[in-house]
Amino acid sequence: EFAAYMGVDQEKGEPVLMDFTNRKLLEGYFKYVYEKIEKKDGVDFWWIDWQQGTNTAIPGLDPLWMLNHYHTMHSQKKDGKGLIFSRYAGPGSHRYPVGFSGDTVITWESLDFQPYFTATASNIGYGWWSHDIGGHMMGYKNDELALRWLQLGVFSPIMRLHSTCCEFNGKEPWRYRKEVELIMDKFLRLRHQMIPYLHTMNRRASEEGIPLIQPLYYQNPGKWDAFRMKNEYYFGSDILVNPITQPISTATRMGKVMALLPEGTWIDLFTGTVYNGDRKIELYRSLDSIPVLAKAGAIVTLDARTTGNAIDNPEILKVIVAAGADGSFRLDEEATDNVWCSTTFTYKWGDEAVLTITPEKTKKEGMPAERAYELVFTGTAQGMTAQKKKADGTYETLETSYDSDKQCTTVILPMQDIESEITVVTYNTALADNHQVERIFELLNRAEIEFSLKEKIYAIAQKKGSRNDAYLLDQLTLLNAPEDVFGAVKEILTALD
């Protein structure tokens, strides 16, 4: 039909030449090709990739730019928003598609470039930038490489697993060894749980022009080191991400990355480790995590449900509060398309810390009638208790639990009216001390080094408290331990320096 509409003899194999300055071609292109496929097969999203040619009848006009423009308009007619996925078409093309970094080769060197490429895409307006998680083509099979790439992808604007057509190049988690499969599964579920946080940040990007991912120098323009840390970036308002882009050490079984921590206190969201900022520090992580640090006072909202693909507004929220400072966060949720509902979380730090949850007072269709909360105070010492302030001014004790490995206290708020303002007071609230000796033991227990060296390092670590860190580090240096073993122990000893 399209060929006949354009006056092309299809039986002779004549092509329809793409030129989007031709209005007749433009109209037929959508009417006879795209709209028919959409109606027949239920397609509602298009990836536009390599079909537009390089020239138009108007000198200097990039046909890809025109293609992206009209495809976005076509998408907007269906749902009022418009979303397409396409190639980069030069400066200014960010206004249309989700972009991507091209056909990446599957190597560690290629992975190491992706965080920098993704973060700096924000400099040209491409806040919605993506990469082929795990790499696209050529290269080699490496389970650890695939996992580290996926971990980066979870903390990217768009999470998208993709590869070239190769029967050996699958990205499904079950195509990797069991240890890696389980970690991939955990991270993929985490990405889905982050929808409340991501949707809030994407609204901020749409209305205020602030991208989800920002190079470190956006918030630290006066620090020259911020310009040198190419792979470190902000993920939303108060989270720092440092992807690991090199293989693990055979000695520590951990990967490492050099990070710059801005001023203040920072807490790792996976381990609960507390760090003092305003310095550079090497961070070491096993396969099951990467450094994701929240600034003290940061509040991160997650969907507390752990299974399924639901995208409705959850009846139970997991709210992570980074201990150590005051903070606030406004959660924005869409009740229905373009009808927003906001909830403000305010945290006052202290021995008796106070978290206040203030939802909008107008119930809206699409929001749950009731909501429960799982409050996770990360970076806290053991011994916290919690109470909720009741309407009559009295307090009721809440269920709490402590995870020593992750240094976090969890407080459970049962179901209550979605419009209820909630005040939670925690008592004996203090920052964790990082359980340094215990963590060094765990590190050494995992390390693949001589047993005698493990014993010597651990003996020095047990002097923590009676000797200062400088003395302990001097003693460790004399042992001539492998560089990564020394570095990992040093991170634990000096995190709070």
Per-range role (PLM):
Residues 76, 120, 208-210, 233, ...:
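A generic structural signal for short, solvent-exposed coil/turn residues
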Residues 1-289, 481, 488-497:
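Catalytic-domain carbohydrate-binding cleft regions of carbohydrate-active enzymes
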Residues 234-235, 261, 349-350, 402-404:
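Generic beta-strand structural signal
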Residues 267-287, 385-413:
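Solvent-exposed beta-strand/loop surfaces of large extracellular or lumenal domains
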Residues 292-394, 405-497:
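Accessory, solvent-exposed terminal regions and/or long lumenal/extracellular loops of proteins
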Residues 230-231, 257, 343-345, 398:
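Residue-level detector of beta-strand structural context in well-folded domains
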